[in-house]
Design a protein with these regions (language model features):
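Short acidic, glycine/proline-enriched helix-loop-strand junctions
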Residues: 41-42, 71-89
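N-terminal presequence-like segments and the immediate start of the first folded domain
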Residues: 1-31, 86
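Short, solvent-exposed coil/turn elements at secondary-structure transition points
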Residues: 22, 37-38, 69, 89
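Short, solvent-exposed loop/turn elements at beta->coil junctions and helix N-caps
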Residues: 19, 67-72
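Short, well-ordered alpha-helical segments
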Residues: 27-68
Length: 89
């Protein structure tokens, strides 16, 4: 995306896929979840930064099977991401 990022974490290089296939030689580390306020491009970037930092803390080098949920209730607009953290060998 070409807009400014509002993420609170420094960027981390991480492979991200919506496909659930795990590459050969990789190990699954667990599921990671992040949720932030807002439903827009900035909230998506902020949420992705939070998700990659949580995965990185587990030792992950990639995320697979990523799912996006955007709740637009009047009183609680949120962007949430869920993915499986893996380590590529």
């Amino acid at each position: 995306m070409t807009h400014e990022t509002h993420a609170t974490h420094p960027p981390i290089q991480m492979s991200v896929s919506t496909l659930p296939d795990r590459p050969a030689g990789s190990s699954e580390l667990g599921v990671v979840y992040a949720s932030v306020e807002g439903v827009n491009d900035h909230s998506f970037d902020e949420c992705l930064a939070e998700l990659t930092h949580k995965a990185h803390a587990l030792g992950a080098t990639a995320l697979i099977g990523m799912q996006l949920v955007q709740s637009q209730f009047q009183w609680n607009q949120r962007t949430s991401l869920l993915a499986t953290a893996i380590k590529l060998e």
